[in-house]
């Protein structure tokens, strides 16, 4: 009787160990975290651990077939097109560049083979490359681009909300609001 109980006990322990170590085909354990919906308030959150709320931004239209440069800051700049976006520990900035003109639609951030759509958060001394997020452009006019953005990297970098960027074109030797 003791042998039967010992074998039963060992069998149960063995099954428990095998069950605990086995893998599952449940997709929910492997799926990536889905991104939240866009906030309907002004783009805000944390950059480099500092509270951040969007104030001024621009997209620079290249004078030739170069790249479109995007800059967003929490600084209240007097002129989105001609001001300097420096980025500092108290006012980090967001920068990005794309080879295509802004157009209505949505894109996910990525950094993998064949895909390099990223944002850079800059705090005056360090560039943080952000590869998780999404950007949705709602409207593009001669003078502005409106949209929504969600971007995250760890607990110190997360923003979500809406933005309006000035479209800036070269006018002589300076940039000014586009007037096509």
Task: Please identify what each model-predicted range represents.
Residues 36-58, 116-124:
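Tryptophan-anchored aromatic micro-motifs
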Residues 28, 148-180:
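Edge beta-strand at a domain terminus
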Residues 15-42, 173-174, 179-180:
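Bacterial Sec-dependent N-terminal signal peptides
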Residues 58-139:
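Surface-exposed helix/loop patches within compact recognition domains
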Residues 22, 80-82, 109-116, 167-170, ...:
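Sequence contexts marking disulfide-bonded cysteines in secreted/extracellular proteins
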Residues 129-154, 158-160:
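Extended, loop-rich substrate-binding clefts of extracytoplasmic carbohydrate-active enzymes
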Residues 1-20:
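Sec-dependent bacterial lipoprotein signal peptides
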Residues 38-39, 66-70, 141-148:
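Short, hydrophobic/aromatic-rich segments at coil-to-beta transitions
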């Amino acid at each position: 009787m003791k042998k039967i109980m010992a074998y039963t006990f060992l069998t149960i322990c063995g099954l428990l160990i095998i069950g605990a170590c086995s893998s599952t085909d449940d997709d929910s354990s492997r799926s990536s975290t889905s991104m939240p919906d866009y906030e309907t308030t002004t783009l805000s959150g944390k950059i480099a651990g500092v509270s951040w709320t969007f104030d001024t931004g621009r997209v620079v239209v290249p004078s030739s077939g170069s790249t479109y440069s995007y800059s967003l800051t929490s600084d209240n700049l007097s002129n989105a097109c001609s001001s300097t976006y420096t980025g500092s520990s108290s006012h980090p900035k967001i920068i990005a560049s794309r080879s295509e003109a802004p157009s209505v639609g949505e894109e996910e951030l990525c950094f993998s083979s064949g895909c390099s759509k990223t944002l850079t958060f800059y705090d005056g001394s360090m560039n943080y490359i952000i590869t998780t997020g999404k950007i949705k452009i709602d409207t593009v006019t001669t003078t502005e681009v409106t949209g929504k953005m969600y971007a995250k990297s760890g607990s110190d970098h997360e923003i979500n909300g809406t933005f309006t960027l000035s479209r800036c074109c070269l006018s002589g030797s300076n940039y000014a609001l586009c007037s096509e």
